[in-house]
């Protein structure tokens, strides 16, 4: 099915999608601040421009939207229109994520992905549960991991 917008309108709409200071980033920043952690945001000098960098623990945190980064949860749904386009676009995002995570690990950084579904929606984690998972991972100095509605898991 053809796009209902012309190229210029579609481009304008896509540019309007926030890439920083999103609601999920603000929630996570509040929780990190509440834990007394010092962090930097959107560090362009690191691969993938991590949303949060906690130098003290040599770790970076990404907040990933479930749609844009193809998380297998209830928030991800393949669009009914232009399916091939979207699957290709999202597939490129996933491949870039893998490449960025690998490069960060090679540089000695631990990586945490906090999925959108853990931060918002009907199955989101409570602030208490999310804070516990964050503290457990950041202070525990374990391997790279991800947090979703089911809790914390090692990155595959």
From Swiss-Prot:
The keyword Hydrolase applies. The keyword Thylakoid does not apply. Gene3D superfamilies: VSR Endonuclease (3.40.960.10). One of its GO terms (biological process) is mismatch repair. SUPFAM superfamilies: Restriction endonuclease-like. Mg(2+) 2 binds at residue 51. Binds 2 magnesium ions per subunit. Binds 1 zinc ion per subunit. Its cofactor is Mg(2+); Zn(2+). Deamination of 5-methylcytosine in DNA results in T/G mismatches. If unrepaired, these mismatches can lead to C-to-T transition mutations. The very short patch (VSP) repair process in E.coli counteracts the mutagenic process by repairing the mismatches in favor of the G-containing strand. This enzyme is an endonuclease that nicks double-stranded DNA within the sequence CT(AT)GN or NT(AT)GG next to the thymidine residue that is mismatched to 2'-deoxyguanosine. The incision is mismatch-dependent and strand-specific. This is DNA mismatch endonuclease Vsr. The lineage of its organism: Bacteria, Pseudomonadati, Pseudomonadota, Gammaproteobacteria, Enterobacterales.
């Amino acid at each position: 099915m053809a796009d209902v917008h012309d190229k210029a309108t579609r481009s304008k709409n896509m540019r309007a999608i926030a890439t920083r200071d999103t609601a999920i980033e603000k929630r996570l920043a509040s929780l990190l601040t509440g834990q007394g952690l010092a962090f930097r945001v959107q560090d362009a000098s690191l691969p993938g421009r991590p949303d949060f960098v906690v130098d003290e623990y040599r770790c970076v945190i990404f907040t990933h939207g479930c749609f844009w980064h193809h998380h297998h949860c209830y928030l991800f749904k393949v669009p009914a229109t232009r399916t091939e386009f979207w699957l290709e676009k999202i597939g490129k995002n996933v491949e870039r994520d893998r490449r960025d995570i690998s490069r960060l690990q090679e540089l000695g950084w631990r990586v945490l992905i906090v999925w959108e579904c853990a931060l918002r929606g009907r199955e989101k984690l409570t602030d208490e549960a999310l804070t516990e998972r964050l503290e457990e991972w950041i202070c525990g100095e374990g391997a790279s991991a991800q947090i979703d509605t089911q809790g914390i898991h090692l990155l595959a």
